């Protein structure tokens, strides 16, 4: 009996020294297969056993921030320390249970992270990850407030400091992936379809990426301002273009950083190398997916602009074309004569090479003592090309555009205030406003031409280019906006019943634009151009008094404002794509001026 008592006493002492399992009491007991703990003979209560949040096996305690078993603890530790990357052969929703946890290591690691296991706890079990996230965001915020060129360096230095504190081989991506709460149920926490932030990023990564993109953009703007201050002689670009470029650069930088984070946090390949996060290039597939989605959005918006116009043209499809369009009479052969003369003409883009620049320009006051235009100079009669089958509409548009631009320049050369200018000044003014002049001519001769056919061909050409993958989406958007602007402008002037004299004055107001002459040596020439523009405005005001007073004048001038946004490249693409080829309209304008003199147009 004494030996039995001693043996019983030793066993009770050993059980007292063992760690409690499942919240058992300090009294002796033996674990039972059912999951409970057998208490003493007098105890009737049975305490429940905690289960692993990952696989559902019996948990041995809280490991790396989550209640888990020894198997999942060891698996998570090996994956983090060895920086292992897994791939799922299924749909990334494999079952992770006690008996099937070894089938898919990828889904098992994902469920470990979703259950609350922290990768930084593998190295530093007593330092929570929340403090480090706040430290990284605070470091990035301090670098943004400091400004200057050290914004990105402060961000990177702060990031490297935290990496050194964690030790080698630690991963920011694996660290920030453990976002769900610890006490959430496994079925609710592990749901791959509930991604709040884009591309699988969490709040900390998204905040860091956007903040770093802002810092980089501010740094680029400061460098651009500093470089611009040292070169005052360089002509500055349009402020609106600079603003658009900066917005595009900022968007591109932000997309690249987001793609870096997405590629490093790819759900199919976990990357635990934190040193490659700020310098790794985005994968081709990720950047291609982002860029293609943005391109489709731009193209879709551009095509949406054209849809109401196309619907209106279809409703008005019964509009009859003027008899001139159906006649089989050939044109006068003016363009053929021009082409024949261009073959024997020396290519002189400066129109005689007179480069006085307006510094010694003498104003002839006699032109201001008479009317700017006469009824003959305001008349605009274009001979329309033959309108045949619908599949030849593109040739109709090209031929119409060429006749309009030739007739516009020929009409302007008869105006005395335009004849006073030197040849290179005439070219400079025409190059700046020729898209707006074509819009004026299209609205003036809408009774002679089939304007619905032209607008309909613009819509068809834009839709055809939208189906080509190599065409830039911005080009599609410009063409769609230009089509809408031309359509609205023609419709508005048609409702106002504008006279030929008013059309001629509007043409002079657009052409004599002093903002096109910004060089210092063109000061006297700029004053002359401003006087002509003011004289044309006063003449238009008097014309408006005849037809409707001050209100009509204000309406006509307001209709000119959208014409300043017409894009020259888009206008060339819509009107002259099949006619001039690779030669731009800026290069053709000097030839048209010379041929209008030599051929007697």
From Swiss-Prot:
ZnF locations on chain (NR C4-type): 52-72, 88-107
Keyword tRNA-binding carried by entry: no
Induction: By 20-hydroxyecdysone (20HE) 106 hours after egg laying.
UniProt-listed GO biological process terms: cell differentiation; defense response to Gram-negative bacterium; liquid clearance, open tracheal system; open tracheal system development; positive regulation of innate immune response; regulation of DNA-templated transcription; regulation of transcription by RNA polymerase II
Annotated ranges, domain NR LBD: 329-596
This protein's UniProt keywords: DNA-binding, Metal-binding, Nucleus, Phosphoprotein, Receptor, Transcription, Transcription regulation, Zinc, Zinc-finger
Places the protein is found: Nucleus
Annotated region of DNA binding: 49-124
Annotated spans, Disordered: 140-183, 214-249
Low complexity compositional bias, start-end: 215-226
Residues with Phosphoserine modification: 327
Observed phenotype of the null mutant: Death during the larval stages, due to defects in tracheal development characterized by fluid filling of the second instar tracheae. Mutant larvae that survive into the third instar are smaller than wild-type larvae and fail to pupariate.
Top-rank lineage group of the source organism: Eukaryota
Keyword Cytoplasm: no
TM regions (residue ranges): none
Entry GO CC: nucleus
Cited Pfam families: Hormone_recep (PF00104), zf-C4 (PF00105)
One Gene Ontology MF term: zinc ion binding
Subunit structure: Homodimer.
PANTHER family cross-referenced by the UniProt entry: NUCLEAR HORMONE RECEPTOR
Family per record: Belongs to the nuclear hormone receptor family. NR2 subfamily.
Protein task: Binds to direct repeats of the sequence 5'-AGGTCA-3'. Inhibits the ecdysone response. Plays an essential role in regulating molting of the tracheal cuticle during larval development.
The protein's name in its UniProt record: Nuclear hormone receptor HR78
């Amino acid at each position: 009996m004494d030996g039995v008592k001693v043996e019983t006493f030793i066993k009770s002492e050993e059980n007292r020294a063992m760690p409690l399992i499942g919240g058992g009491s300090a009294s002796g007991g033996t674990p039972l297969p059912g999951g409970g703990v057998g208490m003493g003979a007098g105890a009737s209560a049975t305490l429940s056993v905690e289960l692993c949040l990952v696989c559902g096996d019996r948990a041995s305690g809280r490991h790396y921030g989550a209640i888990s078993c020894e198997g999942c603890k060891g698996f998570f530790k090996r994956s983090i320390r060895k920086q292992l990357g897994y791939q799922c052969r299924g749909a990334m929703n494999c079952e992770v249970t006690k008996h099937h946890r070894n089938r898919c290591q990828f889904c098992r690691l994902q469920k470990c992270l979703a259950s609350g296991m922290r990768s930084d706890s593998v190295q530093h079990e007593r330092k929570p990850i929340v403090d480090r996230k706040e430290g990284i965001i605070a470091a990035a915020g301090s670098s943004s407030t400091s400004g200057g060129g050290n914004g990105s360096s402060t961000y990177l230095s702060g990031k490297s400091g935290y990496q050194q504190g964690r030790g080698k081989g630690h991963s920011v991506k694996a660290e920030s992936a453990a976002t769900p709460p610890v006490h959430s149920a496994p079925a609710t926490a592990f749901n791959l379809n509930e991604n709040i932030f884009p591309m699988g990023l969490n709040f900390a990564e998204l905040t860091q990426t956007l903040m770093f993109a802002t810092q980089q953009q501010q740094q680029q703007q400061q460098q651009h301002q500093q470089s611009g201050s040292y070169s005052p002689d360089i002509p500055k670009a349009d402020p609106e273009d600079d603003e658009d470029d900066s917005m595009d650069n900022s968007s591109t930088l932000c997309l690249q950083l987001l793609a870096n984070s997405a590629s490093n946090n790819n759900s199919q390949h976990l990357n635990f190398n934190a040193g490659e996060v700020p310098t790794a290039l985005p994968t081709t597939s990720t950047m291609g997916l982002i860029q293609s989605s943005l391109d489709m959005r731009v193209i879709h918006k551009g095509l949406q602009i054209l849809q109401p116009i196309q619907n209106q043209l279809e409703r008005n499809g019964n509009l009859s074309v003027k008899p001139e369009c159906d006649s089989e009479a050939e044109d006068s052969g003016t363009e053929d004569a021009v082409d024949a003369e261009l073959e024997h003409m020396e290519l002189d883009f400066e129109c005689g090479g007179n480069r006085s620049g307006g510094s010694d320009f003498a104003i002839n006051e006699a032109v201001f003592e008479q009317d700017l235009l006469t009824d003959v100079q305001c008349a605009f009669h274009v001979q329309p090309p033959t309108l045949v089958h619908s599949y030849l509409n593109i040739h109709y548009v090209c031929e119409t555009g060429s006749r309009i631009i030739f007739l516009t320049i020929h009409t302007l050369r008869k105006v005395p205030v335009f004849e006073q200018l030197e040849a290179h000044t005439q070219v400079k003014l025409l190059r700046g406003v020729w898209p707006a002049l074509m819009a004026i001519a299209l609205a003036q001769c809408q009774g002679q031409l089939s304007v619905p056919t032209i607008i309909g061909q613009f819509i068809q050409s834009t839709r055809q280019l939208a189906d080509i993958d190599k065409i830039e989406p911005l080009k599609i958007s410009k063409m769609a906006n230009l089509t809408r602007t031309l359509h609205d402008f023609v419709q508005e002037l048609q409702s106002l019943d504008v006279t030929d004299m008013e059309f001629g004055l509007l043409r002079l107001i657009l052409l004599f634009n002093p903002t096109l002459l910004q060089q210092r040596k063109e000061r006297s020439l700029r004053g002359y151009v401003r006087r002509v523009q003011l004289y044309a405005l006063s003449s238009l005001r008097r014309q408006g008094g005849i037809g409707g007073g001050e209100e009509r004048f204000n309406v006509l001038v307001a209709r000119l404002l959208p014409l300043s946004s017409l894009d020259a490249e888009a206008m060339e693409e819509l009107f002259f794509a099949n006619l001039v080829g690779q030669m731009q309209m800026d290069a053709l304008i000097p030839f048209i001026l010379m041929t209008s003199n030599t051929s007697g147009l």
